[in-house]
């Protein structure tokens, strides 16, 4: 049996500000060479957890291991392997994108002469490198942040909301770039987001945070196996439809929201249920076969409401 190698591990990682616990005993496991998506509403504790991994905030309790080593040991060696964006990247507004990266490269050290140019090309800013940062769009600023994080070719990327502010084309490009970086270069990527559809498309593993707790950690392939198929009816009266399912077919595996009833029980055909609804005077305006996605799963896990 192969032992999984983790690039990031936390054990009972906790952060308190006064009497408020913002991260509560989380145990994260980020496999080497994989993309780990950390999901959660704003205020769930995602950014604070990432800050503790980078020593931008210090744990109240618990430990962090990077590359199998306690991050308090050999700190400079460990962090030379890490690139990161936490919250909004900071740059000099009166300097060009290229000049900003040159300064950061000198401060960081270990960046090859071609590293800055290559990073700008990878994120699609090579033609804009002489433009002053204050003239960059929000999406361009976000790309420059990613360029700063990758210019020293790190083994681990920690990215807090990296697609924030990007248009659909930019999101697609960054998604493709991160996937390529992971699958071709073996870079481990730890990414936070509240955009469920984007995480679902690129992540190998997801963790879900809610009110400071890590409530789930699961391989995306396993999650897809769990997602259940269902038939959805839009009807004139959902409560009557529910009573029909219970009395006529003894069904209990369904949900009702207003005039939409979602049936997970396939003991009866869709045609039979449709006829029974019609016989009881219900108007059916839509029938659709589908299966639950990551958003459905997330909503059930944290009690509905989605991510805001």
From Swiss-Prot:
Binding site for ATP: 40-47
Induction: Transcription is activated by the regulatory protein BcrR in the presence of bacitracin.
Ranges for domain ABC transporter: 8-236
Protein keywords: Antibiotic resistance, ATP-binding, Nucleotide-binding, Plasmid, Transport
One record GO biological process: response to antibiotic
PROSITE patterns: ABC_TRANSPORTER_1 (PS00211), ABC_TRANSPORTER_2 (PS50893)
GO terms of molecular function: ATP binding; ATP hydrolysis activity
InterPro entries xrefs: AAA+_ATPase (IPR003593), ABC_transporter-like_ATP-bd (IPR003439), ABC_transporter-like_CS (IPR017871), P-loop_NTPase (IPR027417)
Traits of the deletion mutant: Disruption mutant is sensitive to bacitracin.
Record-stated family: Belongs to the ABC transporter superfamily.
Function: Essential for high-level bacitracin resistance. Part of the ABC transporter complex BcrAB. Probably responsible for energy coupling to the transport system.
Subunit field text: The complex is probably composed of two ATP-binding proteins (BcrA) and two transmembrane proteins (BcrB).
Protein name in the entry: Bacitracin transport ATP-binding protein BcrA
Gene name of this polypeptide: bcrA
């Amino acid at each position: 049996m192969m032992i999984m190698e983790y690039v990031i591990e936390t054990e009972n990682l906790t952060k308190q500000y006064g009497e408020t616990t913002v991260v509560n005993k989380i145990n994260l496991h980020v496999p080497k060479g994989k993309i780990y998506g950390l999901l959660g509403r704003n205020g769930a504790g995602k950014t604070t957890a990432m800050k503790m991994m980078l020593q931008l905030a210090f744990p109240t309790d618990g430990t962090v291991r990077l590359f199998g080593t306690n991050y308090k040991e050999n700190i400079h060696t460990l962090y030379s392997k890490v690139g990161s964006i936490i919250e909004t990247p900071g740059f000099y507004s009166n300097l060009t994108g290229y000049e900003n990266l040159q300064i950061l490269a000198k401060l960081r050290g270990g960046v090859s002469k071609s590293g800055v140019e290559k990073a700008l090309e990878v994120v699609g800013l090579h033609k804009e490198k002489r433009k002053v940062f204050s003239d960059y769009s929000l999406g361009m600023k976000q790309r420059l942040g990613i360029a700063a994080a990758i210019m020293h070719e790190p083994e681990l990327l920690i990215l807090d909301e990296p697609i924030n502010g990007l248009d659909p084309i930019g999101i697609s490009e960054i998604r493709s770039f991160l996937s390529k970086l992971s699958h071709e270069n073996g870079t481990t990527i730890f990414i936070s987001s509240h955009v469920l559809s984007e995480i679902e498309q690129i992540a190998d593993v997801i963790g879900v945070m809610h009110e400071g707790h890590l409530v789930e950690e699961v391989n995306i392939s396993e999650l897809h196996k769990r997602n259940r198929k269902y038939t959805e009816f839009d009807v004139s009266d959902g409560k009557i439809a529910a009573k029909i399912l219970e009395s006529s077919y003894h069904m209990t595996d369904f949900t009702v929201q207003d005039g939409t009833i979602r049936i997970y029980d396939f003991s009866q055909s869709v045609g039979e249920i449709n006829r029974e609804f019609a016989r009881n005077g219900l108007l059916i305006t839509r029938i659709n076969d589908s299966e639950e996605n990551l958003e459905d799963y997330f909503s059930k896990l944290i009690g509905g409401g989605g991510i805001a």
